[in-house]
Each structure stands twice: as structure tokens, then as C-alpha cells.
């Protein structure tokens, strides 16, 4: 990005407004003026006009939090802003879909906010497919009941309407409903699926015919773990809907045959 020259008078005025004139000649301040410092490059690349508009539209979430105040539990809405790795991942996914990809792996380290990324993706990809006259339906796949409960809490705290599927029957009931939304609230929805209890189910998955304007999107959490995709329910599920989008999230992108990331 082209950088404009710093107006020295404006610089002095800004420092004066914050009562920070004394730092002007310090070595640390002069270093921070460099355009190639890591922090400056991240901030300026994130705040380019296109990306800043993207953050304003998709990158703000209000998370319901509870805290104790004077012995009472109060509920507040805490504003969360999309982190840089979440923004770059969302932009990359959208670009890859535009280039014709239908699957891919997002490699984000532990603590980078993969569940929050999935929340943002429900809005980013819903808009992406709306422009194609298609309706996106989201499934978040985990492999333990505690992860299902954790993801459900995280999504609900951010305002998503969450359905859960702990058994094959529950998931098939979800698939038989060809509507993009299960409820009537009009809020964004996601289905959280615990694959653990029926991962070894090798029975062929029969999906009912559905309108061509419905786009299923599967997001797999911790995809480096042993989902055992070969000849199991997960593989059969993907085969039953070849037009679905598969996004694997992992901090350890192993490509062994027993990991979901190898299939995606």
C-alpha cells in the first residue's frame, strides 16, 4: 500500500492532544514510525478501505457475558472485533470459493478463535451465496459431547440459533428438512453435530432431493483428530452431498489417512 508522508504539524498536534510530546524524540517512537515494522504492516493492511468495510460489516459481534457485581449476577453484551487471522481466513475462504474450490483446511493455532471464526463465516458465506440466489445452511461438526456443549454456548452467546444432533436419527431429521432455517425467529442458524456417537456407522447415507438453491456448508472442528473418514459415516455423508462445502479447522494440520483434514 502507498504511504503518505507524515505531516509534522499534524503529528505535533496529535501528540499534544494526548499530552505525549515528550515521546517525540525517543528512539522507540522513531522506530514505530517505520512503515515496515510488523505492527504497522498488520494495522495498515487490515485497515485498507476494502478490509475495513469488511470488518465493519461482518467483524463485530456482541457476546453475552455474565459477571458478578455487588453479589449479583449481571448480564452484559461485550463487543468483540474480528481478529486479523479470522479476517484473513474469511477472505481467503471466500476467494477460494470464487475460484471454484469446494473444500479446504484452515490452519489456526490454539487460542486463535476457530469457533468465533465459524460464527463470522455464517454471515460472510450467507451473503456470498445470497448473491448467487442460494441459501447457505451450516453444520459445525465436533467429535465429543463436551465440545458440542462448548460450541453451542459460544454460538448462542453470539446470537446464533443453535440446533444440535447427537444421533444419526437427529441429523437425518435435520437433512430431511430442506429449509435453510429450522426456527421462525429469522436469526442466523447453525447445527452442531457430535459425530462421535455414530462415527463408525458405515450404512450408506441417503439424503433427500433438495432444491438446487440450498448450499450445505460443513465446518469440522479439530480436524486433525481421528474422524476415520475412510468408509465411515463422515465419508458417506460427504459422498451423499458432493456439492457441499467442507471447511476443516485445525491447529495441527496432519494429513494422515485417519484425519478429516486428509479428506478435505
Q: Where in this protein do the model-derived segments appear?
A:
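Hydrophobic positions in the central parallel beta-sheet of the AAA+
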Residues: 140, 191-193, 218
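Conserved motor-coupling elements within RecA-like helicase/translocase cores
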Residues: 169-191, 209-210
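Conserved beta-strand scaffold positions in the cores of enzyme catalytic domains, especially
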Residues: 105, 192, 246-248
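ATP-dependent helicase/translocase motor core
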Residues: 1-142, 146, 150-162, 186, ...
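Conserved helicase motor
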Residues: 145, 165-177, 195-200
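Signature of the SF2 helicase/ATPase Hel1-core->accessory helical subdomain module
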Residues: 1-3, 7, 197-205, 211-264
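A generic local structural motif
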Residues: 126-127, 169-177, 203-207, 232-235
Amino acid at each position: 500500500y502507498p504511504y503518505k508522508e507524515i505531516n509534522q504539524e499534524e503529528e505535533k498536534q496529535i501528540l499534544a492532544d494526548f499530552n505525549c510530546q515528550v515521546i517525540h524524540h525517543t528512539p522507540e517512537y522513531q522506530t514505530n514510525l517505520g512503515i515496515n515494522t510488523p505492527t504497522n504492516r498488520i494495522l495498515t493492511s487490515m485497515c485498507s478501505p476494502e478490509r475495513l468495510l469488511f470488518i465493519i460489516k461482518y467483524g463485530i459481534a456482541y457476546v453475552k457475558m455474565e459477571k458478578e457485581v455487588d453479589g449479583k449476577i449481571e448480564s452484559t453484551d461485550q463487543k468483540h472485533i474480528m481478529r486479523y487471522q479470522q479476517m484473513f481466513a474469511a477472505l481467503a475462504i471466500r476467494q477460494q470459493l470464487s475460484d471454484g474450490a469446494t473444500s479446504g483446511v484452515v490452519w489456526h493455532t490454539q487460542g486463535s478463535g476457530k469457533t468465533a471464526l465459524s460464527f463470522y463465516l455464517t454471515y460472510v458465506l450467507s451473503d456470498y451465496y445470497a448473491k448467487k440466489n442460494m441459501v447457505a445452511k451450516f453444520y459445525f461438526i465436533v467429535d465429543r459431547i463436551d465440545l458440542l456443549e462448548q460450541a453451542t454456548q459460544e454460538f448462542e452467546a453470539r446470537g446464533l440459533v443453535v440446533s444440535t444432533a447427537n444421533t444419526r436419527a437427529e441429523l437425518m431429521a435435520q437433512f430431511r428438512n430442506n429449509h435453510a432455517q429450522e426456527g421462525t425467529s429469522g436469526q442466523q442458524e447453525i447445527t452442531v453435530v457430535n459425530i462421535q456417537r455414530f462415527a463408525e456407522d458405515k450404512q450408506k447415507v441417503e439424503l433427500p432431493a433438495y432444491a438446487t438453491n440450498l448450499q450445505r456448508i460443513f465446518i469440522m472442528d479439530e480436524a486433525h483428530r481421528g474422524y476415520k473418514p475412510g468408509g465411515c459415516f463422515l465419508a458417506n455423508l460427504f459422498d451423499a452431498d458432493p456439492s457441499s462445502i467442507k471447511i476443516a479447522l485445525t491447529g495441527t494440520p496432519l494429513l494422515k489417512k485417519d484425519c478429516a483434514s486428509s479428506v478435505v
